[in-house]
Curated annotation (Swiss-Prot):
Pathway: Cofactor biosynthesis; NAD(+) biosynthesis; NAD(+) from deamido-NAD(+) (ammonia route): step 1/1. It catalyses: deamido-NAD(+) + NH4(+) + ATP = AMP + diphosphate + NAD(+) + H(+). Belongs to the NAD synthetase family. Pfam families: NAD_synthase. Mg(2+) binds at D51, E163. Catalyzes the ATP-dependent amidation of deamido-NAD to form NAD. Uses ammonia as a nitrogen source. Keywords: ATP-binding, Ligase, Magnesium, Metal-binding, NAD, Nucleotide-binding. This is NH(3)-dependent NAD(+) synthetase.
Length: 272
C-alpha cells in the first residue's frame, strides 16, 4: 500500500461520493451521537465559509428531525468575529441558509486583546501575529464550550480530509470539538453537499481563508499552505499529482500527526 493509499484510508476518504447519501449518513451520525450522549443539542461557530456553513446546516437538519420524532434538542449558531469581519455579509448569508434555532454573536476582540496585552506586560514581548491568530481560534473554542457546558450542548467541529491531511487547524482551537460530521470529505465533496442542499454558490465558491492574521487579513488558505485545494483533493481521491506536490502533502501529513492524536504519553507509539 502506498503512502497515498494509507492516508486515504486513515482519513476515510472515498474517491467518489453520492452527495444525497453523504448528507443522509452525516445527519444520521449527528442524530445518533446526540441521542447516545443524552446531550441537548449542538453549538457551532459560523464563519461564513464553506465548512461551517455545511456543518451548520447538517446540524439544523438533525435537530429538526429529532424534534419531529418527539425529542427535545436545539442548535445554537455562534458568530465569533474579531472586531469587524471582512466578509461579514457572507456570514449573514450563511446564517440565513442554515436557519439555526438560535444565533448569537460574540466579538472576541476584547478578550484576545486583553490577553495579548497581559502577555506582553508579563513576558516582555509581543505575541507574534501567527501566535495571536491561534489565540483567536482558541478563544472561539472556549466560547463554544462555555455555551455547550452551560446548556448541555455538544460542540461541532468542521475538520475534513483536506484540513486533516495538512494539519491546517489550530490545536485545541478549531481542532477542539466533540464530534466531526465532515470527516472524510474533500473540499470539492463538501461543495457538492452544499450544492445538493441548495446553498447560494457564493458560500462554496468563495476563497477559503482561516482569517486569523492581523497583518494579512483574509489571506487565502492556499497561499499559506503553498498547495491548492484542487491538488489536495486530487491526492486524497487517489488521483495522480506532481511529485513535488505529493511530497509537500506527505511532509505536512507526517509533521502534523500530533494534531490528529490525543496528547502523547509514554505508552503510545504513534509518535515514535
Amino acid at each position: 500500500m502506498t503512502l497515498q493509499e494509507q492516508i486515504m484510508k486513515a482519513l476515510h476518504v472515498q474517491p467518489v461520493i453520492d452527495p444525497k447519501v453523504e448528507i443522509r449518513k452525516r445527519v444520521d451520525f449527528l442524530k445518533d451521537y446526540v441521542k447516545k450522549t443524552g446531550a441537548k443539542g449542538f453549538v457551532l461557530g459560523i464563519s461564513g465559509g464553506q465548512d461551517s456553513t455545511l456543518a451548520g446546516r447538517l446540524a439544523q437538519l438533525a435537530v429538526e428531525e429529532i424534534r419531529n420524532e418527539g425529542g427535545n434538542v436545539t442548535f445554537i449558531a455562534v458568530r465569533l468575529p474579531y472586531k469587524v469581519q471582512k466578509d461579514e455579509d457572507d456570514a449573514q448569508l450563511a446564517l440565513q441558509f442554515i436557519q439555526a434555532d438560535q444565533s448569537v454573536a460574540f466579538d472576541i476582540a476584547s478578550t484576545v486583546d486583553a490577553f495579548s496585552n497581559q502577555y506582553e506586560n508579563l513576558l516582555g514581548e509581543s505575541l507574534t501575529d501567527f501566535n495571536k491568530g491561534n489565540v483567536k481560534a482558541r478563544i472561539r473554542m472556549v466560547t463554544q464550550y462555555a455555551i455547550g457546558g452551560q446548556k448541555g450542548l455538544l460542540v461541532i467541529g468542521t475538520d475534513h480530509a483536506a484540513e486533516a491531511v495538512t494539519g491546517f487547524f489550530t490545536k485545541f482551537g478549531d481542532g477542539g470539538a466533540d464530534l466531526l460530521p465532515l470527516t472524510g470529505l474533500t473540499k470539492r465533496q463538501g461543495r457538492a453537499l452544499l450544492q445538493e442542499l441548495g446553498a447560494d454558490e457564493r458560500l462554496y465558491l468563495k476563497m477559503p481563508t482561516a482569517d486569523l492574521l492581523d497583518e494579512k487579513p483574509g489571506q487565502a488558505d492556499e497561499t499559506e499552505l503553498g498547495i491548492t485545494y484542487d491538488q489536495l483533493d486530487d491526492y486524497l481521491e487517489g488521483k495522480a499529482v506532481p511529485a513535488d506536490v505529493a511530497e509537500k502533502i506527505e511532509k505536512r501529513y507526517t509533521v502534523s500527526e500530533h494534531k490528529r492524536q490525543v496528547p502523547a504519553s509514554m505508552f503510545d507509539d504513534w509518535w515514535k
